Amino acid sequence: MGEPAVPTNLATILPGGKASVPAGAPAPVVRAIKAANKLHRKTYIGGGGHRSFKARGYDCSGAVSYVLHAAGVLRSPLVSGQLAYWGSPGPGSWITVYANRTHTYMVIAGLRYDTSPRGEWIDQGRGPRWRYTLGTGAGFAVRHWQGL
């Protein structure tokens, strides 16, 4: 069962908390959204996803690494501090990673994908989830992959 396409470059949060895939999204973005949706409601585990992309649960950098790997732009998991140097500086058109020494999250097609309890609660679980609240990015390195 696939995620329905929406007729803009912005994803939406569907009932149940998963994200839609925007019509016209490039293949790496489609793969990223589908990968993020796979982790929806997975348990938050500190250090989860650091050793392998397959884990029982994920922390912030494990979840972001999993999604970037699915998009084809990351070979092995990185921790938050390493993600602050991944890719190129500045925001991307489709995927932007926000990272500092202790936390990371990403914005894909206009939705924030995060594990932190800050902002709007779409899902009360502690694991990776989508939300509309983007945040300011203050205190974070802003990174993207060329072309995305």
Which positions does each model-derived feature cover?
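Intrinsically disordered, low-complexity
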Residues: 1-44, 119-148
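Secreted/periplasmic proteins that engage bacterial cell-wall peptidoglycan
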Residues: 23-93
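...with weaker cross-activation on analogous glycine-rich loops/strands in unrelated enzymes
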Residues: 33, 65, 71-148
